Amino acid sequence: MRKDETSNTSPDISAAQPASALRYQLRPPRRNDGAAIHQLVSECPPLDLNSLYAYLLLCEHHAHTCVVAESPGGRIDGFVSAYLLPTRPDVLFVWQVAVHSRARGHRLGRAMLGHILERQECRHVRHLETTVGPDNQASRRTFAGLAGERGAHVSEQPFFDRQAFGGADHDDEMLLRIGPFTHPPH
């Protein structure tokens, strides 16, 4: 068991977070969370559902840069998958932000992202990068809010166009770059 799995303390969620976000325990995912995470993502369109194996690997190999939001009843209602870029370790790449419909509207996604950035393993991160589809306004609001909390700039550029996805019906993906992070949230 990793030392960070034993903590039952509540996360330090910014005062800007609604009280309803406080009911969730934010923690690194565990290997046995893989199936619940897979189920959660399947219930969060338009997110791309990856294989259960991929979520198990994220729980096992990238727990230090991923987070789950667990309800008092033990249900996983939120998940963020992220990793440090191997060639630029001061950049956190966020792969997916999943928040179940029953937990939306409470800035849980932003709280989970902030929780990852506050971990000791991510204190050196100066930029966050992620991709979003052009019509995903909820994700854009989440990342803009995080940038505002941290006094950071958001830039956008093309990343993957629809041709990169082969014959799949997939929108273009734009790269959002947030940073530099110069101070903790207010």
Swiss-Prot record:
NCBIfam families: ectoine_EctA. InterPro entries: Acyl_CoA_acyltransferase (IPR016181), Bact_Acetyltransf (IPR050832), Ectoine_EctA (IPR012772), GNAT_dom (IPR000182). Keywords: Acyltransferase, Transferase. It is an enzyme of class 2 (transferase). GO terms for biological process: ectoine biosynthetic process. Its EC number is 2.3.1.178. Belongs to the acetyltransferase family. EctA subfamily. Residues 24-179 form the N-acetyltransferase domain. Transmembrane segments: none annotated. PANTHER family: AMINOALKYLPHOSPHONATE N-ACETYLTRANSFERASE-RELATED-RELATED. GO terms for molecular function: diaminobutyrate acetyltransferase activity. This is L-2,4-diaminobutyric acid acetyltransferase. Pathway: Amine and polyamine biosynthesis; ectoine biosynthesis; L-ectoine from L-aspartate 4-semialdehyde: step 2/3.
